[in-house]
């Protein structure tokens, strides 16, 4: 239901309720809420305010609902908005919109174009936000878990942008610590001619072929020298570049790449530790420094500084999030794997200590988290667990190439088209389920070009409409004067209803940090279109009816295009 129609009906309901309350000396009513009936034959919108008020007002809910409807029918504009209303069950008011109210969405979409569905931030809500996602260690290629983060984070950023929020995308490079040291040792071992399985191969080394690629490239470079620090710097730079290439192929861009190492070099970590010590948030025991996280809801206190003097990994995380707040980002969302769940309490606890020391008003729930579960890749009915290049996992690059059907024999143009197909499939698939559910990625399904493939199903709806409009040969501007009252079939009614839900669906998905809701919606919209296409011929001889149906299809194509853009998926005109 369009927000304009919804707000008008709520205003009418509020006025009718207020009139009843004043007439009968009853307490002031709350603002009524509207919902979509579960069954289509129950109408377009329902309200249960009579049930809510019946006890407080000591009235029979059906009688109250009837009195409410009678008052509504006396209001100016009610009959233009509502075609009929019936009292159902114990006191539900089910409304059916007038044809004019239902079809108004078509012209609103055509006039709104690419901005249809977008809105401004609600009063008092954040107007800017940071989303941190992917944030992979520069120790290897991006794996499918990073791919899920990239798809979720980018779609979430686009989703928030539709609500007028200025979004900052950030990638946190974990370029300090033991894993980076292991990377350097792995490359050094390859330079020495060792390989996985050899007796002298380091126990914690990375085994993928990419380590050999780094070693070969470094040995041929002018910077080459047998020095562990030089090897470390080259390997990190090499893998950062590789990850950037993968992200570019995936269609994801960041505004900032923040280095963990900078938190040590600029003294941020030391300052955070000092702040927490100065307010009594820490204590020393058994030769280590502890943070009092139990006070903030954690199940036990956590080690900050180990006996060897090194810090545990959540300490720079606290420093990093202090930087986020200090840079003015009061709305921060972290998209991370569910294995990070245990760090949430300790990071928030550390931030509360910093806030206390510095006089900041950081909310206890800062930052927000979207945690995703693992991705399992299936191909030819079997789970794919390793990649030749990565050694122990499937990479994002593998997933995109497999899903697009990329082969070595392809021309550069064919390869680019295949990569686009793969990127679209991977992004749509990885967004199409709630983040907190495990996902099985079926390569064979991604390659199918039929209704079983969800991204093909949605994109084909867009392409089919484009083909119909091309056959017609007119201009979209010609549809502005279409007589939309002619749209009276059951199939068109379902399609109109789905189109009208788009703006509110976007708002709800943004509020709930749930981009999967948009993927669900687009599948439903494509389904309603395909049903309409099979039921109602569009290019009919009746010119007025043809223009009305073409206007409906043009509006549908626009919403499909807008929604796919938010997900980072293309909307092809041909397939």
UniProtKB/Swiss-Prot annotation:
GO BP annotation list: arginyl-tRNA aminoacylation
Catalytic activity: tRNA(Arg) + L-arginine + ATP = L-arginyl-tRNA(Arg) + AMP + diphosphate
Primary location: cytoplasm
Subunit field text: Monomer.
Gene coding for it: argS
Family: Belongs to the class-I aminoacyl-tRNA synthetase family.
Keyword terms, alphabetized: Aminoacyl-tRNA synthetase, ATP-binding, Cytoplasm, Ligase, Nucleotide-binding, Protein biosynthesis
Stated name of the protein: Arginine--tRNA ligase
Signal peptide: none
Enzyme Commission number: 6.1.1.19
Alphabetized NCBIfam families for the sequence: argS (TIGR00456)
Subcellular location per the Swiss-Prot or TrEMBL entry: Cytoplasm
CDD domains hit by this protein: Anticodon_Ia_Arg (cd07956), ArgRS_core (cd00671)
GO MF terms held by the record: arginine-tRNA ligase activity; ATP binding
Lineage: Bacteria, Pseudomonadati, Pseudomonadota, Betaproteobacteria, Burkholderiales
């Amino acid at each position: 239901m369009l927000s304009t129609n919804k707000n008008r009906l709520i205003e009418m309901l509020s006025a009718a309720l207020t009139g009843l309350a004043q007439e009968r000396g009853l307490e002031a009513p709350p603002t009524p809420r509207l919902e979509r009936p579960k069954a289509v034959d129950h109408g377009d919108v329902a309200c249960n305010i009579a049930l809510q008020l019946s006890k407080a007002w000591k009235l029979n809910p059906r009688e109250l609902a009837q009195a409410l409807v009678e008052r509504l029918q006396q209001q100016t504009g009610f009959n233009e908005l509502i075609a009929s209303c019936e009292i159902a069950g114990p006191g539900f008011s089910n409304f059916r919109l007038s044809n004019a109210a239902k079809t108004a969405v078509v012209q609103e979409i055509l006039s709104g174009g690419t901005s249809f569905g977008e809105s401004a931030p609600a009063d008092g809500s954040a107007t800017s936000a940071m989303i941190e996602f992917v944030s992979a260690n520069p120790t290897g290629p991006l794996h499918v878990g990073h791919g899920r983060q990239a798809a979720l984070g980018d779609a979430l950023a686009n989703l928030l942008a539709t609500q007028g929020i200025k979004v900052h995308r950030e990638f946190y490079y974990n370029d300090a610590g033991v894993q980076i040291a292991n990377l350097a040792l792995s490359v050094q071992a390859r330079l020495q001619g060792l390989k996985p399985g050899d007796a002298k191969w380091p126990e914690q080394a990375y085994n993928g072929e990419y380590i050999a690629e780094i070693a070969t490239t470094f040995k041929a470079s002018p910077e080459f020298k047998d020095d562990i620090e030089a090897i470390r710097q080259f390997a990190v730079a090499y893998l950062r570049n590789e990850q950037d290439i993968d992200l570019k192929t995936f269609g994801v861009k960041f505004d900032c790449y923040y280095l963990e190492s900078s938190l040590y070099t600029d003294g941020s970590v030391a300052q955070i530790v000092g702040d927490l010590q100065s307010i009594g948030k820490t204590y020393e025991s058994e030769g280590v420094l502890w943070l009092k996280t139990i006070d903030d809801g954690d199940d036990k206190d956590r080690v900050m500084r180990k006996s060897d003097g090194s810090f545990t990994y959540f300490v720079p995380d606290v420093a990093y999030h202090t930087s986020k707040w200090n840079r003015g980002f009061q709305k921060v969302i972290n998209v991370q794997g569910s294995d990070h769940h245990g760090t949430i309490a300790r990071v928030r606890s550390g931030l509360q200590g910093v806030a206390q020391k510095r006089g900041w008003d950081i909310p206890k729930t800062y930052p927000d988290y979207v945690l995703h579960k693992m991705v399992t890749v299936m191909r030819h009915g079997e789970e794919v667990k390793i990649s030749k290049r990565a050694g122990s996992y499937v990479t994002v690059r593998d997933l995109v190439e497999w899903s697009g059907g990329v082969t070595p024999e392809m021309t550069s143009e064919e390869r680019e088209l295949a990569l686009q197909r793969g990127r679209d499939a991977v992004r749509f698939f990885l967004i199409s389920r709630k983040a907190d559910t495990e996902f099985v990625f079926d390569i064979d399904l991604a390659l199918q070009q039929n209704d079983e493939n969800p991204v093909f199903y949605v994109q084909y709806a867009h392409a089919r409409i484009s083909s119909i409009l091309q056959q017609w040969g007119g201009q979209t501007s010609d549809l502005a004067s279409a007589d939309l009252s002619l749209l009276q079939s059951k199939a068109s009614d379902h399609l109109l209803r789905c189109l009208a839900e788009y703006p509110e669906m976007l708002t709800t998905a943004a509020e709930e940090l749930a981009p999967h809701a948009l993927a669900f919606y687009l599948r439903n919209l494509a389904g309603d279109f395909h049903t309409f296409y099979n039921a109602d011929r569009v290019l009919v001889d009746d010119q007025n009816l043809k223009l009305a149906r073409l206007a409906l299809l043009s509006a549908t194509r626009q919403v499909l295009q807008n929604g796919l853009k938010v997900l980072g998926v293309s909307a092809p005109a041909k397939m």
